[in-house]
A protein has these predicted regions:
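Charged DNA-binding/catalytic regions of mobile-element recombinases
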Residues: 1-295
């Protein structure tokens, strides 16, 4: 009996064991309860209270499609129509996105790399293509600049850096964090815009040191780095616009919480089948392991 065997494997993560045996976690939980259902159907008042609680907890980042999946993940299945109705009737909405603004300076005489990525935003495996960009964040103490490195495979932020000035250090620090975290093999493609920070000799030396291939967007074409710019739009929409940060330390703490706690590990991503980046990667790795065992 698969469920009885799973019950003995306490040293391994439950989700991984269930995935290897092709059974659902919910099915295993039901077996533990003797086949009894987990919860009765919630009333509209109870469901609304739960939706409002999640909306407040996640600071309004989810519309109805993601809310349906979040409820399901928490053990409260509900139809898309029901969640849409409750959110509409009670004016519960996701925060609206704003247009992206360019922050890097591409007016320089430094060498420019060709656009090798060419908008191929769906690599077949992790650590094949990383993309980078910089954005600005205002606090009462002054500006902060955030540089990120994003793995296109699972949209995970693998490296990031916050500094009060937009110098070359900000992008090299983000790249260094990403490299030490993932240790990718030589040949990884790194894509960015033509900003002077990315074209600088220091950053190009860092790429060469890590065995990475440089790719840059075409002049004035934001769509060549669309996934990274989209991430900044979501980040600012969900954590910056309409909010006040008194100190740089407060902004830094918020950025850490958003990237490392919420986005990478919890936030559903529509292009990943409404999984978080790390969950998507974990599921992919489990699938790879199963295929190796079969082979």
């Amino acid at each position: 009996m698969k469920y009885a065997w799973i019950d003995k494997q306490r040293e391994f993560p439950l989700t991984e064991v269930c995935a290897i045996l092709d059974v659902s976690v919910s099915g295993y939980r039901s077996w533990q309860r003797g086949g009894r259902p987990n919860r009765k159907r919630l009333t509209d008042i109870q469901m609304l209270a739960l939706i409002q609680s999640i909306h407040a907890e996640l600071k309004g980042i989810y519309g109805s499609p993601r809310m349906v999946r979040e409820l399901r993940d928490r053990g409260f299945p509900a139809s898309k129509e029901r969640v849409e109705r409750l959110m509409r009737e009670n004016d519960i909405r996701a925060r609206h996105k704003r247009r992206y603004k360019v922050t890097t300076d591409s007016k320089h005489n430094l060498p420019i790399a060709p656009n090798l990525l060419d908008r191929n935003f769906n690599p077949a495996a992790p650590n094949q293509v990383w993309t980078s960009d910089i954005t600005y964040l205002w606090t009462d103490e002054g500006w902060l600049y955030l540089a990120i490195v994003l793995d296109l495979f699972n949209r995970e932020i693998v490296g990031w850096s916050l500094k009060p000035r937009m110098t070359t250090d900000i992008v090299t620090d983000a790249l260094t964090m990403a490299w030490f975290r993932k240790r990718p093999a030589a040949g990884l493609m790194h894509h960015s815009d033509r900003g002077s920070q990315y074209a600088s000799h220091a950053f190009q030396r860092a790429l060469e040191k890590y065995g990475m291939i440089c790719s840059m967007s075409r002049k004035g074409n934001c769509w060549d780095n669309a996934p990274t710019e989209s991430w900044f739009n979501s980040f600012k929409n969900e954590r910056v616009h309409g909010l006040r940060y008194e100190t740089r330390a407060e902004m830094t703490a918020m950025s850490f919480e958003y990237i490392e706690v919420l986005y990478n590990r919890k936030r559903q991503h529509s292009s990943l089948g409404y999984k978080s980046p790390i969950r998507f990667l974990d599921d992919w790795l489990i699938t790879q392991q199963k295929e190796k065992l079969v082979a």
